[in-house]
Amino acid sequence: MAHPKAKVSKSRRDKRRAQFNARTKAATTVNCPNCGEPTLPHRACRHCGHYRGRAVVAKAANS
């Protein structure tokens, strides 16, 4: 039966497992209620600069 040659630390083990999760899970997106563009949840919209009904990032009028 196989056995480890050396102890694998929690940090090293978690780094290895994180690579698997990063490759298998797709990023979740939601539509911005202000402009309708897809954006990441809990972040300001990259297109219009709104978050939770407020303009938090100044955007140019023509973009």
UniProtKB/Swiss-Prot annotation:
Residues 1-25 are annotated as: Disordered. GO terms for cellular component: large ribosomal subunit. Keywords: Ribonucleoprotein, Ribosomal protein. The keyword Ribonucleoprotein applies. InterPro entries: Ribosomal_bL32, Ribosomal_bL32_bact, Ribosomal_zn-bd. The keyword Ribonucleoprotein applies. Residues 1-18 have a biased composition (Basic residues). Pfam families: Ribosomal_L32p. One of its GO terms (biological process) is translation. GO terms for molecular function: structural constituent of ribosome. Belongs to the bacterial ribosomal protein bL32 family. HAMAP family: Ribosomal_bL32. NCBIfam families: rpmF_bact. This is Large ribosomal subunit protein bL32. It comes from Chlorobium phaeovibrioides (strain DSM 265 / 1930) (Prosthecochloris vibrioformis (strain DSM 265)). The lineage of its organism: Bacteria, Pseudomonadati, Chlorobiota, Chlorobiia, Chlorobiales. The gene is rpmF.
